[in-house]
Amino acid sequence: LTGLIGRLMYIEHTSGDKYEKIVLSQQEYDSQTIPYQRGDIVDSKGTVLATSIAVYNVILDCSVMTSKEEYIEPTIQALTSCFEDMDSNTLYGYAKEQNDSRYIVLKKKASYEEIQPFVEMQEAVDEKGKKINPNIKGVWFEKEYQREYPYGALASSIVGFTASGNVGVNGLEQYYNETLNGVDGREYG
């Protein structure tokens, strides 16, 4: 027992930094920003005149997708089958030439309905609870909000509009800008 403790102390002293780097590189810790949702503008009867809807950026983390050879093909096939505007040659190019990149935006402002087939394919399980597609790796969705005006130009001079994301420029959007805006959150995991 004393010999084992002595050996562990020797390894820690001579190679501790090397092993610490290996352990830290294997950890799957991440932190994500949770975007705030700008408040709705409603009339006296509760009719929504301005609202924010969730949209998603499709993000490719090439370092995860290319970490094992068996992840590349299934991930690219899933992306091209679920998103018709994605090209497999472009995705293979990212895998080959940007394999260290952790953040490549593949598609901006996709609706929930557009990303749902991919999410279902990625999370599908069989009757025993085992993942059907365990090799789809390195794709995630970045949520943000887009301002919408259900009645278009109706009362637009009063309601106003936003620019540069969530900055009220005119009308109620500008007057109540501080009230309508929120603060981004953060999720750790």
Language-model-derived ranges and their functions:
Residues 1-189:
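Periplasmic/cell-envelope proteins involved in peptidoglycan metabolism and beta-lactam response
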